[in-house]
């Protein structure tokens, strides 16, 4: 018997990208997030289906190189940055963009000799507290980048929201305000919003937005589905039933007897 199969609807992907574009200003660009094998949907297939996106975002160098080897020529941003100085010549040779947020990354950029400069995004920690340059360290970090011969000037800025899916939480508004304050004196491009921010925090659209799960037809909001937002599910999982059981009322099922027949 054939096992479970996952079917990918390319038209749904393209529809969802159109929904994204309908919610942002015409001059805001779209970075399609295809990390983690495009959320399990197939990295190369999804990237090529979303060919009208302005750029792609991945988490690891290996993902970026797979895209390049498949013929993808549009900008690719490594959201977590690089983790070894040895990666820098590879980034430069493949025209990859990278987040920078640690002292080690900054030192590597300052000390390497690269064949051509790379485009970087300064990841600012505005409240997520997972990755990023702390606000009080931002100007000093940027001053060193401004002198760095290995990066394209001007450099760009990126941050990530911690509570954008909670519309009554003031944290997102505070993050937007802090990000704007930290970057107001710099000329680079800016990116704040992922799926929840795109849908509900319109003052965070800036120069680039980063749709992730909404591209695949899912809602970032509790109690909502993608259909509620006009999105279409991209993946359908199909399999065969191996049995149909008829249970009596109050009979438990499975380990721990957690579920009881009504």
Question: What are these language model-derived features?
Answer:
Residues 1-97, 103, 116, 152-153:
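A charged N-terminal "starter" segment
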Residues 10, 22, 51-52, 69-70, ...:
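Generic serine detector
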Residues 13, 17, 31, 122, ...:
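Unusually extended, aromatic-enriched hydrophobic runs near protein termini
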Residues 36-48, 94, 106-119, 126-251:
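Active-site loop/helix belt of alpha/beta enzymes
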Residues 255-262:
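Short, intrinsically disordered, charge-balanced linker/junction segments flanking boundaries
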């Amino acid at each position: 018997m054939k096992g479970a199969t996952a079917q990918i609807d390319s038209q749904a992907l393209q529809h969802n990208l159109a929904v994204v574009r309908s919610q942002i200003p015409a001059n805001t660009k779209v970075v399609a997030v295809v990390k983690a094998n495009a959320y399990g949907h197939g990295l190369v297939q999804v990237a090529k289906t979303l060919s009208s996106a302005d750029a792609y975002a991945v988490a690891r160098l290996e993902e970026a190189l797979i895209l390049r080897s498949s013929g993808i020529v549009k900008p690719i941003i490594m959201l977590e940055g690089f983790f070894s100085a040895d990666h820098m010549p590879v980034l430069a040779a493949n025209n990859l963009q990278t987040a920078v947020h640690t002292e080690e990354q900054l030192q590597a950029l300052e000390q390497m000799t690269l064949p051509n400069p790379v485009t970087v995004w300064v990841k600012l920690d505005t409240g997520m507290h997972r990755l990023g340059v702390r606000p009080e360290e931002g100007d000093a970090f940027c001053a060193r980048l401004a002198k760095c011969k290995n990066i394209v000037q001007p450099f760009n800025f990126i941050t990530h929201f911690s509570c954008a899916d909670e519309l009554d939480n003031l944290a997102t508004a505070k993050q937007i305000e802090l990000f704007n304050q930290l970057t107001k004196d710099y000329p680079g491009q800016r990116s704040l919003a992922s799926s929840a921010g795109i849908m509900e925090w319109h003052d965070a659209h800036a120069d680039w937005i980063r749709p992730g799960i909404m591209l695949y037809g899912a809602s970032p909001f509790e109690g909502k589905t993608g259909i509620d937002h006009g999105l279409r599910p991209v993946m359908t999982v199909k399999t065969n039933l191996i049995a149909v059981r008829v249970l009596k009322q109050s009979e438990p099922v499975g380990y721990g007897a957690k579920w009881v027949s009504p």
